[in-house]
Amino acid sequence: METKDLKKLAKAELHCHLDGSLSLDTIRQLAALAQVDVPQDDSELKQLVTAPETCESLMDYLKTFDVIRPLLQTPQALTLAAYDVVKQAALENVIYIEIRFAPELSMDQGLTATQVVEAVLKGLEQGQKEFGIVAKAIVCGMRQSSLDISREIFANVLEWANKGLVGFDFAGNELDFPPAVLADLIKETQAYGLPFTLHAGECGCPNYIVDAIDLGIKRLGHVTAIHNQKDLLAKFIANDVTAELCFTSNLQTKAARTVEDFPYMQLRQAGAKLSINTDNRTVSDTNLTKEYELFVKHFETSVTDFLEHNRDAIKASFASPAEKEALLDRLEKAYQSYIKK
């Protein structure tokens, strides 16, 4: 398929980080609001906020986020940022998106976690009204931070549960802070009633995927370490888990050292549920259309495959049952003309 056709395909995205996905124009607006100097030249600014094509590691990749953190410290900035990412998604025919962020990273200048979430939800709502997309929020704890900080944040933001906030996650340094370290807090938070997704297996540790599945988590981000793990793949499928795949990001961070190390084909051939995602649109210099192009190029993914992956994404989403039904109907209708070709 040509790029223009891939762009026209209806899409759903489950794994997109707010602070890693801001457009250059919005970064400039945010910098002006924060009175922070950034390069006026697009190529210079892009170099500042985009990770190298090949990083030394995940931690090397994450350094890029340090540039954005000071720009997301006010309600106005957070609302603008959330609106920007929704707009970007809608313009490439994403009909459903879950945008995740860590309130802790926007609390440097006195905002509370509740204020951070409120501001992000305001931006999501503006984008939904303007573009006809459905956009939800996932709140992340940072793995490397004190568990007490994440515990307090998760508890405090519950007032927004099912008012746009639909789930929780842990992001950050997986290698040193595996699921076992987070297990008790994850169980506590699951008791609140909102679902969990979790970054798992991005650092090359299959056991971290096992631990996440054993916590009853039904959506896992990256799962790169499932590659060539036959028993783990069987467990993944038996537990009805959906993979949130992030191809470009995984190659950058060396989670997958080569295209052959990326687990998509093994997941697909085994009948596992999966979704295709950007992870970080700006940091990885990508969007969903680019990701789809790469899947066509490297894996010969077909329109029928994309339809199936988007069905999986919507079914595994944290949207309400009624929203899922409407989104699935919209998805099927959008693909009818392409499937017939």
Curated annotation (Swiss-Prot):
Keywords linked to the UniProt accession: Hydrolase, Metal-binding, Nucleotide metabolism, Zinc
CDD domains, per the entry: ADA (cd01320)
Co-factor(s): Zn(2+)
Pfam families recorded: A_deaminase
Record-marked site positions (Important for catalytic activity): 222
GO BP terms in the entry: adenosine catabolic process; hypoxanthine salvage; inosine biosynthetic process; nucleotide metabolic process; purine ribonucleoside monophosphate biosynthetic process
Similarity comment: family membership: Belongs to the metallo-dependent hydrolases superfamily. Adenosine and AMP deaminases family. Adenosine deaminase subfamily.
PANTHER family membership: ADENOSINE DEAMINASE (PTHR11409:SF43)
Name used for this protein in its record: Adenosine deaminase
Species annotation: Streptococcus equi subsp. equi (strain 4047)
